[in-house]
């Protein structure tokens, strides 16, 4: 909210698809309420980014099997590093643990904070849902410690099977 009041773009992390849409609307409304022109609001919305974890395979099960355990391992490692190195009096936002496979429904749920993980059809649907709630820019990372081959295959599927749908 404070960044919207001064017209600065932000990076939105985490949240469900619908939660992300709510944050974008709050940002837009706050910026408008602070007296910025419609053009200035649009320019800032064009510079607003949403950060998601991503892993794509041919099928949902393959992606879940490749990524989720590796993502949990990376999460645990980072939590250990934070506990060791962050000063105890330092206030930091607590990172939410990644969802387990059983938390992913057959189709993406816009009210659950899902990573963008699955077969390319599922992830295409997730990108479309984010676009529908106002996301214009996505920063996608692969936090799981998957092999270089699997990461490269995921990126290839992103560029060949998903991105052409959104050009």
PLM features: residue spans?
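Glycine-rich, proline-tolerant flexible connector loops at the mouths of alpha/beta enzymes
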Residues: 14-15, 85, 139-155
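Hydrophobic faces of well-ordered beta-strands that scaffold small-molecule active sites
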Residues: 8-13, 46-53, 138-142
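Alpha-helix-loop-beta-strand connector modules within alpha/beta enzyme cores
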Residues: 155-167
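Short catalytic/ligand-binding loop motif for oxyanion handling, primarily in non-cytosolic enzymes
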Residues: 1, 20, 58, 148-149
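A structural motif corresponding to the C-terminal end of an alpha-helix
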Residues: 6, 129-136, 165-166
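A conserved active-site cap/scaffold subdomain adjacent to cofactor or substrate pockets
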Residues: 1-28
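An alpha-helical appendage that flanks or caps ligand/catalytic pockets
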Residues: 19-135
């Amino acid at each position: 909210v404070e960044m919207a009041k001064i017209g600065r773009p932000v990076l939105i992390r985490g949240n469900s698809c619908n939660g992300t849409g709510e944050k974008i609307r709050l940002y837009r409304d706050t910026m408008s309420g602070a007296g910025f022109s419609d053009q200035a609001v649009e320019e800032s919305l064009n510079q607003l980014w949403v950060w998601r974890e991503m892993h794509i395979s041919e099928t949902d099960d393959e992606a879940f099997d490749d990524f989720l355990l590796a993502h949990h391992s990376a999460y645990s490692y980072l939590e250990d590093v934070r506990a060791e190195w962050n000063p105890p009096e330092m206030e930091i936002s607590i990172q939410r643990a990644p969802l387990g496979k059983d938390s992913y429904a057959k189709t993406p749920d816009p009210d659950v904070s899902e990573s963008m993980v699955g077969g390319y059809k599922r992830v295409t649907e997730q990108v479309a849902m984010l676009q529908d709630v106002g996301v214009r820019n996505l920063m996608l990372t692969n936090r799981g410690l998957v092999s270089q081959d699997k990461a490269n295959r995921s990126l290839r599927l992103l560029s060949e099977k998903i991105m052409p749908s959104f050009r």
